[in-house]
Amino acid sequence: MNSLDQWRDTWAKVLSIQPSEIDDQDSFFDLGGDSVKAIQLLSEAAQSAINVDLQTFYDNFWNIISPQLRGENRSGPIDRGGSIATGEADDSIGLLKTDVNLEVVEKALSKVNIARESVCRMAPISSIQEFFLYLGLNGHVGLINYVYQVEGRDLKQGLARLVKHLEAKNPIFRTVMIEDDTGKFTQVQLSHSISTWTYPTDLQAYLDETMTGRQRLGASPVRYSLVLKDERHKGQNFFVISLDHTHCDAFSRYLIDKEILQILKQPTEYASLQNPERPWYGDFVKHNRAHILDEQLSRYWASYMQGATLANVHPLSEAVVGGELDGEMVEIVPIPVVSQSRGTRGQTNPSHVILAAWAMALSKHSGLKDITFGLARHGRSSDSFTDLRRVMGPLVTGTPFRVTLNDTQERTEQLLNRVKEEVLKTARWEQGMVPNIHPDAEGNPWVQSMVNLKSELYGFGNESWTGDEAEADITAIKMRRDLQQYEFKSNWAILLSTLQKQGQLRLRMYYQSQLLSHDKAQALFASFKSLIAELAAADGSLVTGLLD
């Protein structure tokens, strides 16, 4: 992006508004943005080597970015370029110094037939990686499948070349997990890929098969598949990237799509030395450990959770580890639009309405006025790690989210503003060992519902690409997110997923019927839907009036 007008168009596309609606004084939240959409747009900024810290972006993006795009000089929290500190080399193995024991790791490498000469970097694994690794090793979580419909003269050769470029610039595809004799896991970045290809004849059968396997230590985290002339899909061809969940998240799909399109459009420029390798997730884990101390994190969350009651869906004694989400309810409703009463124009973010409505629905269900549930976070709020917005990996995490509803004089607008502040305040502490989200060794209780606010990453940018050369190895590619599937067992009684898309809000509630009967689930879901509409139309009404 080279002009202010182009940036304005990009912003408008992300927010699903007209460019003319964006004023220089608007904040991101005023225009209906949320943290995931912010990351999406900031990723575009990173392509132009412009880094803006997330908080500044929320507060007033245009006053800061406009001078940069006009070529003016202005001091402020913007950094152009920059590199990641990679640490000191250890000559004994040619690796970066980490907190891992090199001798122990070398033994673990030999067990999985990985030569130490092929190792570039090592790092501990993150808590979210450990969570998904245990699920994967025990067969409780399938692979993440990214499906593309493809056309071309020689797809095998063309896709092999595309994958070679992709793996060269993105170290997450060359990262394997190992375990030493002490039971400690380490992620290892290799100098070359050990990925494999398969050529199934039936796409759906292949996708089903990827849901039943187990993750293997020392194995490639990625598998590529090419399905030619699938009969179930009218002879169409499909390219599938299948990844372990320890190596990706929802935003990684968006980044992978951008990389693929760049490779297809500008293969020479993409492969050049001027196009640097993307930051490695393992470096982010080490950075996090150095900058966010576990004791600070523990103190924050201990204070945050003091006096919280987590039993707002079922009694604590009934909690299940790895239960089946065998119930499902789906509804599509209009995106809630709440007009602000303040002097400036703007809207309350729909995400804040959703969070407030869910807290109120749980309050009605449980009779409690102090509600805590889990909130899935994109994990990319930090501005201290260079180019974090281009890091592929499982940065998505979860934190407790607490809403009190015992103020009899509080009005709906005050509640929504309080929810907004809570989202920003807790985002700083989203990485690390966050308590009360999953079962732990100490037997502490965990949240009984998890809310995943999916933004409109779907539908942004190029959904397909068609080349100029009719005889090229790859002539067309189309992202087929509609064919993705993902299943896993849950420790939460409820997984609430929302998706904002094309002016509508899709609500999907998965639940464990052994913890929440169908009748109660139906009543809770109906209450949630009703409260979304009531909050949008409340116009400053008392919150207690909506809870009665």
From Swiss-Prot:
Its EC number is 6.3.2.-. GO terms for molecular function: ligase activity; phosphopantetheine binding. Keywords: Ligase, Phosphopantetheine, Phosphoprotein. The modification O-(pantetheine 4'-phosphoryl)serine is found at residue 35. It holds the Pfam family Condensation. One of its GO terms (biological process) is amino acid activation for nonribosomal peptide biosynthetic process. One of its GO terms (cellular component) is cytoplasm. Nonribosomal peptide synthetase; part of the gene cluster that mediates the biosynthesis of fumonisins B1 (FB1), B2 (FB2), B3 (FB3), and B4 (FB4), which are carcinogenic mycotoxins. The biosynthesis starts with the FUM1-catalyzed carbon chain assembly from one molecule of acetyl-CoA, eight molecules of malonyl-CoA, and two molecules of methionine (in S-adenosyl form). FUM14 encodes a nonribosomal peptide synthetasecontaining two domains, a peptidyl carrier protein domain and a condensation domain. The condensation domain catalyzes a C-O bond (ester) formation and can convert HFB1, a precursor of fumonisin B1 lacking the tricarballylic ester, to fumonisin B1. This is Nonribosomal peptide synthetase 8. It comes from Gibberella moniliformis (strain M3125 / FGSC 7600). The lineage of its organism: Eukaryota, Fungi, Dikarya, Ascomycota, Pezizomycotina.
